[in-house]
Amino acid sequence: MRAGLAGIVLAAIVFLIPVHTVAQSAEKGNAKGKSLDGPGGVIAVNGVRDENLPPPPVGPTPHATDGKPNLSGIWLSGNYNFANMGGALPLQPWAQKVMEERQATQSRDDPEAKCLPAGVPRITPYPFKIVQSPEVIVMLFEGNVHSYRQFLLNRGHDKDLDPSWMGESIASWQGDTLVVDTVNFNDKTWLNGRGAPHTEKLHVVERYSRPDLGHLEAEITMEDPGAFTKPHTFKRTHVLSATWEIHEYVCNEFNVDVDRLVGK
């Protein structure tokens, strides 16, 4: 099992094509668009598709040999304002104060600006590749020196792991929806570019579905009794690219003067 997973990850890394680095700065920007409330109080993320991208392929949902929807492919997030996570987060007073203090310093201490892992769900503005098998699903992200997440299917959480940047993810299929359950985070990441904090009690549930060939829909629920007053759910839609490859992104190479980051 471990050897198989290593092979999947290694294969995904070995065949990267070093063409060019893509700037992903939308998270701190103000993308234009209309904010829409989704069904049942779920809020859709404000965003506008990049008109320079070709339209996604058209066709029915592909299926794997085990009959489950095949989520494999390279997925792009379009030109989204990823600081917007479906409206204001339900932060407790102390967490709201921390976020405001970070904004006042123009996010000078953002861990991602220091080439540290973005965490979940913040990592998703970057293009990512899904490699799917019946036992494990791997997401390889273009950003942050190729962070990856692995979802082991049909097993429980490991109670003996130390908290980590990306947490520990397990997954299961509920009909045609892949449900990813992630816990055991450290408290070092920001939830968004505006500096929203969380604690080690953060629990993230992602529900992925592929309604057709060209789209991957994600419904994300975050709960953190240490920092939130209630759970928060929002949606994102990713589009399949038939031409994109995961490009080399060496954050540390260009981030050579961290002590002089713009900020206050």
PLM region descriptions:
Residues 1-9:
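Bacterial N-terminal signal peptides that target proteins for export
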Residues 5, 13, 17-264:
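PEST-like low-complexity, intrinsically disordered acidic/proline/serine-rich tracts
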